[in-house]
Amino acid sequence: MDSIVSLKGMGKVFHTKNGDVKALDNINLDINRGEIFGIIGLSGAGKSTLVRCINYLEIPTEGDVFFEGKGLKGMSELQIRRVRRDMGMIFQQFNLLSQRNILDNVCFPLEISGVPKPKARQRAKELLNLVGLSDREKAYPAQLSGGQKQRVAIARAVATNPKLLLCDEATSALDPNTTKQILDLIKDINKKMGITVIVITHEMKVIESICDRVAIIENSKIAEVGKVEDIFADPQSEIGKKLILGDVMERKEIVSGVKLRIEFDGRSSFEPVLSNMILSCDIPVNILYAQTKDIGGSAYGHMIIQISGEEEDQKAKRYLDSIKMSYHELDFSDNDNEKISLEKRKED
């Protein structure tokens, strides 16, 4: 694949009066041209520092950032500014100019780039139409809702036709309905304009909604990288499992039996797998946990079931093998007490 951004051994250390703080540690990532790439992690994991290193608002202390194959480390400040022209960025806090109406806000980066005013205004009008605000061009930021402000910020960020759009927690201050609208807009811009998008977030729902691939970051390091559907179906890292299954722990007494984690792969999520297994094998099944998600039009998810009895366990496994369902046997034992620790996702 053609990489537009490559991070090679990138690290970032902040020097404080209380000592050095390593914000990023040996980050290696390739972001492909034209994709929507997500970077997710808990607060303090290093997500925002990572995105600020990509456009060199923060200078890495180790490794380097490569944009279209060219390393930024050896560039002059003028050369870096030229590279930044190909990178748009939107933030959680919109950062609009309060004394300018929204048309002039979108014109601002064009003016800085030396675009003649008539051409800049024409381009700004086109973008306001694209983001659904053509009727509000004379309004000021204070007169807009949060979602409308973010639409203006997006229009401004892509005004100079950047090749890359960086989104740093762009929807975390918005309500769920407005968040969906903004994510749909970002996805639409990605398709229509061919802009590569990097999405920084702490919300798995954002990743599921629009991203092609995702990197999970924890404690300043990359925990795992892959296609969204693959990581959702079978997360390998502990932080991946926590982000996908949730963070509310519930402990349940389990008398006995095997616990199986069934993985739905898009093909099978809409099939009555469990019902068919119970009818076919004539075995009782206890559902301990279940969750499915729609990712890119296909359903993915997990189900954790308990089966009592060795014979029943073998019947279930043979059935799952026969229909080519992916599953894993889980061990949730805790010392001498057989218990299960289930992580349940918070539902809005």
Sequence positions of predicted segments:
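Conserved signature/switch motifs of ABC ATPase nucleotide-binding domains
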Residues: 139-142, 160, 167
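Short helical segment in ABC ATPase nucleotide-binding domains corresponding to the A-loop/adjacent helical element
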Residues: 103-111, 121, 125
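ABC ATPase "signature
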Residues: 225-226, 234
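Conserved ABC transporter NBD signature motif
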Residues: 63-71
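Helix-to-loop junction immediately C-terminal to a conserved catalytic motif
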Residues: 55
